[in-house]
């Protein structure tokens, strides 16, 4: 007797959803590079095409805290970014990991239905988010825009969202390298860093016209100032604009994260099926990769968005003010928390600000480290990388820990993995805090996401393309 499952509701819709057909044969590495490049080009073009019908505004961006992480570009076709895909993926992984959704991922049929359900939910999220964005007045008051323009804006956002979903599916099914989510996120972050370093545009922050790009400003100041020492100091430490110190800090963090990627605890294992077969099972320092900092950033960013919306509507309400008081900084229309809970979990905007308010800094650092460690320990239970899951993999593959009895594998893994996950989560949280305090070109979260994604792409390319992986390993060992 077969029982009904929620996933069975999705099966009749499979033929109606847009789909990328899986390749019939293995795609050569050169073609994967080409398709990855084409996918990236489409993303970049969509990031520059403005939405038709919006009323341009210089007001505060309520989604400011999520833009870089979600590969979102305000006022363009990439307004939603990868938000629908990320949200859908996390929801379904949570449902599957907690066994609230009955699915057997070892079954090809179940796996395909599960992926179809994720895609359907991502499309529904695109429709829902697009509708909310338009009706809440992000592009202008709906009454001023009119019904026709509002519908047109929603259609543009939904169409762009579906294109992003299909581009991600194109890479996931083997036509390209990695996933669209990681590729778009890292590209968006690197694009923002490159712009802050080399932007030729000028801005006026009360000191006259200055070049926005840190490197361009350095050469400009050295060429026009007679006092070269003063020009260097200004280029390295100028306020409210990207500077050379921030650029150098970004490079330092980049190489530090690459170096730390090589840190791992190796468990000696042996095969019970083949005599003399020994090996090592590595547990990396970043056992859960960048997931903890993504979840922490998503949590705080959504809290900031809700707090801002409530404060703009009820600025005098004491409960709302307890959550956060929001003001614009000089020379910017963007709102930042100046009091309330939001202020204490908002990263300091500079090292000077962190030193001037040590209580806020201590609270912020403690919050990030503890939340990242907690999310990391929780995520291993959801994602199938907990000690119980790894012990099952060992049993299925006929592996045991060398020098231990077969029955003690789970106990040994339970002693190591949760500790490694929590420590790794706290470590990546500490790196994020360091980025925020040093003022890197981009938030700590975005820098870490970009670096870990670039490193994972290097590993994929090393595996797929066959070029030597020991270059990075040699760099790690050199330290």
Swiss-Prot record:
Keyword DNA damage: no
Cross-referenced Pfam families: Plug_translocon (PF10559), SecY (PF00344)
Cytoplasmic side: 1-33, 98-119, 168-246, 383-415, 459-479
UniProt main location, coarse: endoplasmic reticulum
Membrane-traversing stretches: 34-54, 77-97, 120-140, 147-167, 247-267, 362-382, 416-434, 441-458
InterPro entries per record: SecY/SEC61-alpha (IPR002208), SecY_CS (IPR030659), SecY_dom_sf (IPR023201), Translocon_Sec61/SecY_plug_dom (IPR019561)
Purpose of the protein: Appears to play a crucial role in the insertion of secretory and membrane polypeptides into the ER. It is required for assembly of membrane and secretory proteins and is essential for cell growth. It interacts with other membrane proteins required for protein translocation. Upon binding to SEC62/63 complex, secretory precursor polypeptides may engage SEC61 to begin membrane penetration event. A cycle of assembly and disassembly of SEC62/63 from SEC61 may govern the activity of the translocase.
Species this chain originates from: Wickerhamomyces anomalus (Yeast)
Cellular component per GO, a single term: Sec61 translocon complex
Plastid among keywords: no
Name of the protein in its database record: Protein transport protein SEC61 subunit alpha
Similarity field: Belongs to the SecY/SEC61-alpha family.
GO molecular function ontology, one term from the record: signal sequence binding
Keyword entries, A-Z: Endoplasmic reticulum, Membrane, Protein transport, Translocation, Transmembrane, Transmembrane helix, Transport
Subunit annotation: Heterotrimeric complex composed of SEC61-alpha, SEC61-beta and SEC61-gamma.
Location(s) in or outside the cell: Endoplasmic reticulum membrane
Gene Ontology biological process: misfolded protein transport; post-translational protein targeting to membrane, translocation; retrograde protein transport, ER to cytosol; SRP-dependent cotranslational protein targeting to membrane, translocation
Topological domain ranges for the Lumenal compartment: 55-76, 141-146, 268-361, 435-440
Membrane topology, from the record: Multi-pass membrane protein
């Amino acid at each position: 007797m077969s029982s009904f499952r929620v996933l069975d509701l999705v099966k009749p819709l499979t033929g109606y959803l847009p789909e990328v057909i899986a390749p019939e044969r293995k795609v050569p590495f050169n073609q994967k590079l080409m398709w990855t490049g084409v996918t990236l080009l489409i993303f970049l073009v969509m990031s520059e095409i403005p939405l038709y019908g919006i009323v341009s505004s210089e007001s505060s961006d309520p989604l400011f805290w999520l833009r870089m992480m979600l590969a979102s570009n305000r006022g363009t076709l990439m307004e939603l970014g990868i938000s629908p895909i990320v949200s859908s993926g996390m929801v379904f992984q949570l449902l599957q990991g907690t066994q609230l959704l009955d699915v057997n991922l070892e079954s090809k049929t179940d796996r395909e239905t599960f992926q179809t359900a994720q895609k359907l939910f991502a499309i529904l999220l695109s429709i829902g988010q697009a509708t909310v964005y338009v009706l809440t007045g992000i592009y202008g008051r709906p009454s001023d825009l009119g019904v026709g323009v509002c519908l047109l804006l929603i259609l543009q956002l939904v169409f762009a969202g579906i294109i992003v979903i299909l581009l991600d599916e194109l890479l996931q099914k083997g036509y390209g390298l990695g996933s669209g989510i990681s590729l778009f996120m890292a590209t968006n972050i690197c694009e923002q860093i490159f712009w802050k370093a080399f932007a030729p545009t000028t801005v006026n922050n009360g000191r006259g016209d200055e070049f926005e790009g840190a490197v361009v400003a350095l050469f400009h100041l050295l060429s026009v100032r007679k006092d070269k020492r003063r020009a260097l100091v200004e280029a390295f430490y100028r306020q409210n604009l990207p500077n050379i110190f921030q650029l150098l800090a970004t490079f330092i963090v980049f190489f530090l994260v690459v170096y730390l990627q090589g840190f791992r605890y190796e468990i000696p294992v042996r095969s019970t099926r083949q005599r003399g077969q020994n090996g090592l099972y590595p547990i990396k320092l970043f056992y859960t990769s960048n997931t903890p900092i993504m979840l922490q950033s998503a949590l705080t960013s959504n809290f900031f968005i809700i707090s801002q919306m409530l404060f703009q509507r009820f600025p005098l309400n004491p409960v709302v003010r307890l959550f956060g008081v929001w003001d614009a900084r000089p020379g910017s229309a963007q709102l930042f928390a100046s009091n309330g809970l939001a202020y204490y979990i908002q990263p300091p905007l500079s090292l000077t600000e962190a030193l001037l308010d040590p209580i806020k800094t201590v609270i912020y650092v403690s919050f990030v480290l503890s939340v990242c460690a907690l999310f990391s320990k929780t995520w291993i239970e959801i994602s199938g990388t907990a000690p119980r899951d790894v012990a099952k993999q060992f049993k299925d593959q006929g592996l045991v820990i060398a020098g231990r009895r077969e029955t003690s594998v789970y106990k040994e893994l339970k002693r190591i993995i949760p500790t490694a996950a929590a420590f790794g989560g706290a470590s990546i949280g500490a790196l994020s805090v360091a980025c925020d305090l040093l003022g890197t070109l981009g938030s700590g979260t975005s820098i870490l996401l970009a670096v870990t994604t670039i490193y994972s792409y290097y590993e994929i390319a090393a595996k797929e393309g066959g070029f030597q992986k020991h270059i990075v390993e040699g760099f790690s060992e050199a330290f």
